[in-house]
Amino acid sequence: MIFSGKFTSHLLNYGFKPNNLRLLSTSTHPTIYFTGIQPTGIPHLGNFFGSIEPWTELQNSVDKNILMMLSVVDQHAISLGPLPANELRQNTHQMTASLIACGVDPNRTLLFRQSDVPQIAQISWILGSLQTTSKLARLPQYKEKKERFKKGDIPVGLLTYPLLQAADVLTFKATTVPVGEDQSQHLNLLGGLAYAFNKTYETEIFPIPKQLTRESHARIRSLREPEKKMSKSSGGPRSRIEITDSRSTIIEKCQKAQSDNAGKVTYDKENRLAVSNLLDLYSAVTKTQTSEIDFSNWTTLDLKMNLAEAVDKRLAPIRQKFEELQNTGEVDKVLTENGEKAREIAEKNLEEIRRTIGFL
């Protein structure tokens, strides 16, 4: 395992000694992959290419004896405040169905709902005793999101979000966490907490998880505002393509996507960002590099229609599988059975932790 300079620097805050680096890189813990995804309902293409597809590719390529865990993190979904119960329930069901439709295999990936494993919250509380509010308040994501609360009435869940995130991983002693670069600081904090716990209690209970970031296509951006990433939080429905969108909806959204009137299509992010954004999306959907696409004779209308055709072709089987799942009890069955399996692992690890710190 190779640690970045930032990561090693972060561990220094917990009393880490540089000559102990080898101890961290020779963990005897079995390899366990873990990641989480918030239940925001139906995923869009940004979610698909950014996290779901990389996970399914990993799932289908690693040794079958390696445990892979994917959590639908419904407790994180209320970190900014409560949601209507029916909305959260529906979003969780839709996200789970979407993951299965996109290729997440519940027989290969332990796909479960976070709130079905109460041990995670208990371990989050324990980790909180090793962290300070000042360090949590300095994290960039906290600084950014707290600005939404102009009156200063910031939910506690926003501040402690990284502790729960760390508990998600450490509860299962995960060794590898596939996440984007935007989560690097939270993962650094996670590693620091694992090290601090081990050092405080003179144990090796927790592995120091490593971040797995794959090289991928350019970040999927909004169809209406190409300077921003594709998101449900801004831009409106026409700014994104969801994985269950109908063919007609996909065509309409592509036709109305921002472009320009500069004639033939060229790839120029500096001067033609909107057109380049559509080419990046076409590249991701067709699994080709932008340099391999012959768009020399395309107009912007050609680009939009070709993009719509490619997106519909890619999403058609996913859309069909999602619809099939709506008429069965498979989603609930997966959440129930895998929730039991996840709790069994978590309870065993929690008992070890409780004995270590003196609760037992």
Curated annotation (Swiss-Prot):
UniProt-annotated location(s): Mitochondrion matrix
Enzyme class: ligase
Residue spans of biased composition, Basic and acidic residues class: 220-230
Catalyzed chemical reaction(s): tRNA(Trp) + L-tryptophan + ATP = L-tryptophyl-tRNA(Trp) + AMP + diphosphate + H(+)
Keywords assigned: Aminoacyl-tRNA synthetase, ATP-binding, Ligase, Mitochondrion, Nucleotide-binding, Protein biosynthesis, Transit peptide
GO cellular component: mitochondrial matrix; mitochondrion
InterPro entries xrefs: aa-tRNA-synth_I_CS, aa-tRNA-synth_Ic, Rossmann-like_a/b/a_fold, Trp-tRNA-ligase, Trp-tRNA_synthetase
'KMSKS' region (motif): residue ranges: 229-233
Motif 'HIGH' region in this chain: 39-47
Domain of life: Eukaryota
Any GO MF annotation of the entry: ATP binding
Amino acids binding L-tryptophan: 168
Entry's EC annotation: 6.1.1.2
Coiled coil (residue ranges): none
Span list, region Disordered: 220-241
Entry's Gene Ontology BP terms: mitochondrial tryptophanyl-tRNA aminoacylation
Alphabetized Pfam families for the sequence: tRNA-synt_1b (PF00579)
Annotated TM spans: none
UniProt: ATP binding residues: 38, 44-47, 180-182, 229-233
NCBIfam families: trpS
Family under the similarity heading: Belongs to the class-I aminoacyl-tRNA synthetase family.
PANTHER family xref list: TRYPTOPHAN--TRNA LIGASE, MITOCHONDRIAL (PTHR43766:SF1)
Note: Complex locus in which transcription results in the production of one large primary transcript that gives rise to two functionally distinct proteins, wars-2 and prx-10.
Protein purpose: Catalyzes the attachment of tryptophan to tRNA(Trp).
Name under which the protein is recorded: Tryptophan--tRNA ligase, mitochondrial
Gene: prx-10
